[in-house]
Amino acid sequence: MKVALVGCGAVTQAVYVPLLSRRRELFEVAAVCDLSATLAGAVGDRLGVARRHTDLGEMLAEGGFDAVLMLASGSHGEPVRQALAAGYAVLCEKPLALTEAEVAALPEGRLMVGYMKQYDPAVRRAEEMLAELGGAAVIRSVEVTVLHPSAEAQLGFANLSQARDVDVAPLRAAENAVLDRALGAEAGPEVRSVYSVALGSICHDLSLLRRFTGSPVKVDHVETWGGLPGSIEISGPLPVAGRYSIRWHYLEDYPAYRETVVVHHASGSLELVFPAPYLMNAPTVLTAVSGAETRAEYREVTEAFETQLLAFHAFVTSGKPPLTDAAGALEDIVTAQRIAARYAVQHDLALGGEAGDR
């Protein structure tokens, strides 16, 4: 299957280039695109791709591929719209968009939204075990803790190429305009930070809640401390039974990324401990605690990003549905807006836009 890459930054270089290189029996990279000619050139060199673009519309019009991997940062709403309108299948890294309106504007087409932790073998095993126990109805609590060092700390090993040939000011202005539509132009930096973290990082945990219990329909409490982005605490009821709590901490100099998701049920617990996402084939550890204080560990080195790529291949070539489509991604956008709305109400902060109606 011939694919084109859009966005040649950190995730592309650290994750997708190595994976696409070792799965050449399934994927041929036909073109790359980035606003930075430097990054497009660097990724093109590593993959041996001659066609390198700095204009998405130009690349889509030229064609020569079956699908697009949308890997740039920020909102993907408009570039995904263009790719779908041109008839291409799309794998879009999260978040799909920053607003409900962007999702509503997407044409019909083959779209998969990438939340790689949904494809982690430990997560899939936890889903199976939870189903055997009785599903969402047996859950008493889902508790999430994320310890998040700086991106530089997480990617220091990767020797990434840097873009110094792009003026980022217009990009930031464009993203702020989209955030204005999500939160209202009057929303201040605190609300914008909470929303950005919710859609940029906590969305992984929202995607797991969707798999385990369904999306939260209510946010009871949101608190922050420690300066921006600092620490964020979120809690509320689960849609079937029990409650969820999420504690996300930006700790710039913390030794290593760590994410823990614990599902407590009437007869035990399921605990998932995720490593840094950019360390290929580092296993997530699933620990099941059951009767008589029995503990069983499950770990597998199959890479979640790679399994996600294989799922996209199956989606395009045989029509197997993805775990998250546009509707699932929209659920996360709505939950993130509810988080921002609850935070604004609790702290008497200005809020408008789509979130003002949540």
What do the PLM-derived regions correspond to, one by one?
Residues V49-L106:
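Beta-loop-alpha module in the N-terminal Rossmann-like domain of NAD(P)-dependent dehydrogenases
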Residues A97-V168:
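A contiguous active-site-proximal alpha/beta segment in oxidoreductase catalytic domains
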Residues P189-Y278, R299, E306-K320, Q337, ...:
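Contiguous beta-strand/loop segments that form the cofactor/metal-binding neighborhood of enzyme cores
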Residues M1-L47:
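N-terminal Rossmann-like dinucleotide-binding module
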Residues F27-A31, D66-V68, S196:
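Short active-site oxyanion
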Residues Y119-E143, G156-F157, A182-E186, V191-R192, ...:
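Oxidoreductase and adenylate-handling cofactor-binding alpha/beta cores
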Residues E152-V191:
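Charged, glycine/proline-rich intrinsically disordered loops and linkers
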Residues A67-L69, G109-R110, G226-L228, A311-R358:
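C-terminal helix-rich "cap/oligomerization" subdomain common to oxidoreductases
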